[in-house]
Amino acid sequence: MQDDIPIPRYTLLDGATATNLFSAGMRPDECPEEWMLSHPDQVIALGRAYLEAGSRILYAPTFSANAAQLARFGLADAVAPINRELVGLARQAADGRALIAGDLSPTGLSLEPAGEDSFDELCRIYADQAAALDEAGVDLFVIETMLSVPEARAAVLACRKYKKPVWVTMALNEEGMLLSGGQPLACLVTLERLGVDAFGFNCGAGPEEMVTALRTISPYASVPLIAKPGFPAGAPALDVFADEARRLLDAGAGIIGGCCGATPEHIGAAHNMLTRYVPQPMAPLTSAQENDIWLTNEMALFALDEDRIDFTEPIACGYDMTDDFLAAERDSVDVMLVSIETPDDALDFAGDARFAVVPGCFYSDDPEALSRALFLY
């Protein structure tokens, strides 16, 4: 299916997979993929229950079916067959009445320089799973429970080569920030520019934090917004869940579902609410906001007047660029102008980029070096 899948203004997703399968006998310490493939009837029955409750998009149970997660159970080389078979179970459940989303999630890797894993390795892991999901025939990709912008970027880059929609949902903490500490609005702007087709939140904190985050980002969003709240303290009563779903719609979400703790009954309650829902007007951007140039890193968002951008003098890349970054901040310039002459320059900049407070702008006469810098940053 192509990337122009028609999505209704209000679309209902499914609810939790793992917590419902725990109730069906799956243990938290065993490989979920092996358990599901040895209990296909349980997986199909759960999917069909969501379908009957009103879900129009079912997530294939491929959440942790990437090489890094499967390696814990000696299955790193089985990414393709495991994803293919799990998508097949979702297809049986949907019976042609719902779209199937290929589900990608965090790998558990720790990226350089704080960790030992490279961004290239992260991209390879997601590329392998995305290829398997595409071959299995998913209708769209959902990259969910993302903890940080870099990992979300890697997954988006892996999925984007296929002509299918790519959705991303981030996990929030109790302060309404990304679990990495990043700002939801900065994340939205970054991923929109990467070409995602929908953006939002799942898991992490509960619906209250999602309502706040949605109200913050909805005036700026040019893609549909997703809300799939989890309930770590226990699933609420059905009427409470339906009311929370309504509040998420009022805050700007158009695609809703449930995460940890949400059952088919909860999705049914949200479906009943949707049949009576009256859309609320959203606050527009001011004309000044519409004309701004928006720049982001994971922690901050910068709005610049395109006629008044103050650049630094060209900054050459090197092993330690922190003094240059501090000087740009001290001089109160708007943007650092960074010279990228070789692919190694791109590596040098990426290695220190976490220390940069001022936005960066690359210039280069070498297309390969510039492409590498954009890829890493």
Regions found by a protein language model. Give the residues of each.
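Domain-level signal for soluble alpha/beta catalytic cores
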Residues: 1-377
